[in-house]
């Protein structure tokens, strides 16, 4: 399970700066949920291969006596939901009473806490951080978030307990070598043997992890119970490691699924709450742990900023996507037409996703969701050989040549699969990293159409070979050597 790191501390100690540094954003608004999360901000981060969710809890002010009151509510909830707490202090301002109050609260929580002294640039970090050892939170990690100094080492120290639990990345160096060989053979007109990468792997033998996410009161629990109440075989309820999320194995149409319910499955007679229980942390973790995300949108409320924030997080995580527009029943034809126009206008950036119009309460359209879920999963895990990807790349190049870069035509050599879920196509060539964004989008869309990929984003990565002449001087020809000798002798005579 992807860990959650919460940033806590007084105002103006640099939490937002560190948040922006970790999430590679500028505005610290990766996923902001007004009215529900107050001043908490959420983002997905990756540092040196370590993936995690980072939460900026906002400034916590107050004294040692009143810190419990100041930390109540949303900020306290963020700390409780986090796996790791980074307690940030200002090295330039020194130890403050509010720091002592926050530290006392954190010590009582028995949470993995790291004391981080920010703004140590331009000063002696040992002298500036000496007073903070009195907080009783162990070693003080000195960083300069604005310049990124010490941030990578901090994350490596924080994530050390999770390194053994992380799944090893799949190395494709052997496939890259094979891809280069067969691309060369094909260029010479030789027959390329049929490929079947990873013969032993059949994604259909694995259950599909389906996360149902959405804003409160859009009908997630109603939809979950409708799914479980129709032609289902529930084997058992297995509480997941995600806080309060429930993992429910089920079978539908001879296909196994694991339903990840972030709202909690309740019996039909107990769905009486007007607003469903909602936790941003649970939602983001469920997205990361899923294969396919089913995003539920309220047709009567339209597309909100919260929906767009969730969509952005889903895209960044690379998960497959199916969109369900709920509460479609009872709407007039005019209202439905307006909703469809709005979807076309605001959801153009996820045109690969199937959109279904359903009524979770009455069950209309619910059965068709699983066809799109299965399609999205199959597309995201489909194995494609190097020769096919290279041929598609060549056809795209023939239809629309790459642009000139510094007077030279970009050369695309070969393509191969670089990963799945989401599908990744790696293109090798010369100057490929200088391709314009528009041409990269053209290649992505061309691969999507050619491979008939639906329901999942597709990513294109570019790799350049090293220039064998980089840093080397061309040897002089014999004629150039004679000219050089004549020039040198002429210069000596002139002296």
From Swiss-Prot:
<feature type="binding site">
    <location>
        <begin position="261"/>
        <end position="265"/>
    </location>
    <ligand>
        <name>GTP 2</name>
    </ligand>
</feature>
<dbReference type="GO" id="GO:0005525">
    <property type="term" value="F:GTP binding"/>
</dbReference>
<feature type="binding site">
    <location>
        <begin position="118"/>
        <end position="121"/>
    </location>
    <ligand>
        <name>GTP 1</name>
    </ligand>
</feature>
<comment type="similarity">
    <text>Belongs to the TRAFAC class TrmE-Era-EngA-EngB-Septin-like GTPase superfamily. EngA (Der) GTPase family.</text>
</comment>
<dbReference type="InterPro" id="IPR015946">
    <property type="entry name" value="KH_dom-like_a/b"/>
</dbReference>
<dbReference type="InterPro" id="IPR027417">
    <property type="entry name" value="P-loop_NTPase"/>
</dbReference>
<feature type="binding site">
    <location>
        <begin position="214"/>
        <end position="221"/>
    </location>
    <ligand>
        <name>GTP 2</name>
    </ligand>
</feature>
<dbReference type="Pfam" id="PF14714">
    <property type="entry name" value="KH_dom-like"/>
</dbReference>
<dbReference type="InterPro" id="IPR006073">
    <property type="entry name" value="GTP-bd"/>
</dbReference>
<feature type="binding site">
    <location>
        <begin position="56"/>
        <end position="60"/>
    </location>
    <ligand>
        <name>GTP 1</name>
    </ligand>
</feature>
<keyword id="KW-0547">Nucleotide-binding</keyword>
<feature type="domain" description="EngA-type G 1">
    <location>
        <begin position="3"/>
        <end position="166"/>
    </location>
</feature>
<feature type="binding site">
    <location>
        <begin position="9"/>
        <end position="16"/>
    </location>
    <ligand>
        <name>GTP 1</name>
    </ligand>
</feature>
<dbReference type="InterPro" id="IPR032859">
    <property type="entry name" value="KH_dom-like"/>
</dbReference>
<feature type="domain" description="KH-like">
    <location>
        <begin position="382"/>
        <end position="466"/>
    </location>
</feature>
<feature type="domain" description="EngA-type G 2">
    <location>
        <begin position="208"/>
        <end position="381"/>
    </location>
</feature>
<comment type="subunit">
    <text>Associates with the 50S ribosomal subunit.</text>
</comment>
<keyword id="KW-0677">Repeat</keyword>
<dbReference type="Pfam" id="PF01926">
    <property type="entry name" value="MMR_HSR1"/>
</dbReference>
<dbReference type="GO" id="GO:0043022">
    <property type="term" value="F:ribosome binding"/>
</dbReference>
<dbReference type="InterPro" id="IPR005225">
    <property type="entry name" value="Small_GTP-bd"/>
</dbReference>
<comment type="function">
    <text>GTPase that plays an essential role in the late steps of ribosome biogenesis.</text>
</comment>
<dbReference type="GO" id="GO:0042254">
    <property type="term" value="P:ribosome biogenesis"/>
</dbReference>
<dbReference type="InterPro" id="IPR016484">
    <property type="entry name" value="GTPase_Der"/>
</dbReference>
<dbReference type="InterPro" id="IPR031166">
    <property type="entry name" value="G_ENGA"/>
</dbReference>
<keyword id="KW-0342">GTP-binding</keyword>
<feature type="binding site">
    <location>
        <begin position="326"/>
        <end position="329"/>
    </location>
    <ligand>
        <name>GTP 2</name>
    </ligand>
</feature>
<protein>
    <recommendedName>
        <fullName>GTPase Der</fullName>
    </recommendedName>
</protein>
<keyword id="KW-0690">Ribosome biogenesis</keyword>
């Amino acid at each position: 399970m992807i860990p959650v790191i919460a940033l806590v501390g007084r105002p103006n100690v640099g939490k937002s700066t560190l948040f922006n540094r970790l999430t590679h954003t500028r505005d610290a608004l990766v996923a902001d949920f007004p009215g529900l999360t107050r001043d908490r901000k959420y983002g997905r981060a990756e540092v040196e291969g370590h993936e995690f969710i980072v939460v900026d809890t906002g400034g916590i002010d107050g004294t040692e006596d009143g810190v419990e009151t100041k930390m109540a509510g949303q900020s306290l909830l963020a700390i409780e939901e986090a796996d790791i707490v980074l307690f940030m202090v200002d090295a330039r301002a020194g130890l403050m009473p509010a720091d002592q109050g926050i530290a006392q609260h954190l010590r009582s929580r028995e949470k993995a806490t790291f004391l981080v002294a920010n703004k140590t640039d331009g000063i002696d970090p040992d002298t500036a951080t000496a007073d903070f050892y009195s907080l009783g939170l162990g070693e003080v990690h000195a960083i300069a978030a604005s310049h990124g100094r010490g941030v990578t080492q901090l994350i490596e120290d924080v994530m050390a307990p999770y390194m053994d639990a992380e799944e090893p990345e799949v190395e494709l160096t052997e496939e890259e070598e094979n891809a280069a060989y067969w691309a060369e053979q094909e260029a010479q007109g030789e027959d390329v043997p049929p490929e079947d990468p990873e013969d032993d792997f059949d994604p259909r033998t694995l259950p599909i992890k389906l996360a149902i996410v959405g804003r409160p009161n859009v009908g997630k629990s109603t939809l979950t119970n409708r799914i479980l109440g129709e032609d289902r075989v529930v084997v058992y309820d297995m509480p997941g490691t995600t806080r309060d999320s429930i993992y429910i194995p089920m079978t539908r149409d001879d296909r196994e699924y694991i339903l990840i319910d972030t709202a909690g499955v309740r019996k039909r007679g107990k769905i009486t709450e007007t607003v469903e229980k909602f936790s941003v942390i649970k939602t983001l973790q469920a997205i990361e742990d899923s294969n396919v995300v089913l995003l539920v949108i309220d047709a009567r409320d339209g597309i909100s900023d919260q929906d767009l924030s969730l969509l952005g997080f889903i895209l960044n995580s690379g998960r497959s996507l199916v969109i369900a527009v709920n509460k479609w029943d009872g709407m007039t034809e005019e209202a439905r037409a307006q909703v469809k126009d709005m979807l076309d206008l605001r959801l153009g950036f996820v045109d690969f996703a199937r959109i279904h119009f359903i009524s979770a309460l009455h069950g209309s359209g619910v059965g068709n969701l699983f066809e799109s879920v299965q399609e999205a999963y199959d597309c995201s895990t489909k194995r494609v050989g190097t020769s096919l990807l290279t041929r598609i790349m060549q056809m795209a190049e023939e239809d629309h040549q790459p642009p000139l870069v510094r007077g030279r035509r970009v050369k695309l050599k070969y393509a191969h699969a670089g990963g799945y879920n989401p599908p990744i196509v790696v293109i090798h060539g010369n100057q490929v990293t200088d391709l314009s964004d528009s041409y990269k989008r053209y290649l992505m869309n061309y691969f999507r159409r050619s491979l008939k990929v639906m329901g999942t984003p597709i990513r294109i990565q570019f790799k350049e070979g090293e220039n064998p002449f980089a840093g080397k001087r061309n040897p002089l020809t014999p004629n150039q050597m004679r000219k050089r000798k004549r020039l040198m002798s002429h210069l000596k005579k002139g002296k």
